[in-house]
């Protein structure tokens, strides 16, 4: 029995044996290329996967692959040729026991191939699909199985480019969005000008965040964070590289009253445990 599920569902059978697994690699051109501090995204790739157990139950998962976009096909091939064969026709007690076994099995390969990120992302996608499978099989929404209570998730408009950012926010507002996230980490003056223009036009019920995408050094972040505190920001995302020592994140937290966000570039359960325990990371 997994310790991840809600106590009210402890009688649900979480065991499974996968007999089929299929990757789906997709790509859609972006009408407006998305500019980030690490490069420009000209299309939106995606890698999905479907697993089927020995009773015909199915689950869906997704593998991170947004940049560089050529990584989508690579992750699809990793799933098909490396990860899926280790999964097939074996009996697992639960998705988390399978996750632990796959992590252990491929730890050496991740080092040998120099690909800890892609391998971890593929295993994570399988984990999502397996949890989806056992939840669907039990007839329980996955968020409830894992202890969630709210089916509604607020959405925000992301990927807002530095060029014409205020006009982009206006368009997103017209489409119904009330929360917006701007890409920064370019030139400091331009970033601050965009932030000032957007925050000046925010409505009372609107939320605004910025995403640095790990662009700053610690010194650059320490110099810039106090200026950002003058604006109404819900959070500042990844001001420095995600794997920097906790002492550096703590120094940033002391330099600003704005919450700091991170997480999308953590690739192991241990990374997330450390991230959650850091008093510097609020989101």
Report residues per predicted region.
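Metal- or metallocofactor-binding catalytic centers and their adjacent structured scaffolds
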Residues: 52-137
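Glycine-rich active-site/cofactor-binding loop and its immediate structural neighborhood
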Residues: 149-178, 183-187
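Structured beta-strand/loop patches that form or line metal/cofactor-binding pockets in enzymes
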Residues: 3-60, 64-68
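Solvent-exposed alpha-helices and their adjacent loops that cap or buttress functional pockets
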Residues: 40-43, 146-149, 174, 201-202, ...
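Glycine-rich, aromatic-flanked loop segments that form ligand/cofactor-binding clefts
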Residues: 127-162
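Conserved, mostly hydrophobic/aromatic
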Residues: 49, 56, 83, 126, ...
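Short coil/turn connectors at secondary-structure junctions
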Residues: 55, 140-141, 150-155, 175-177, ...
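Catalytic core of soluble alpha/beta enzymes
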Residues: 182, 187-283
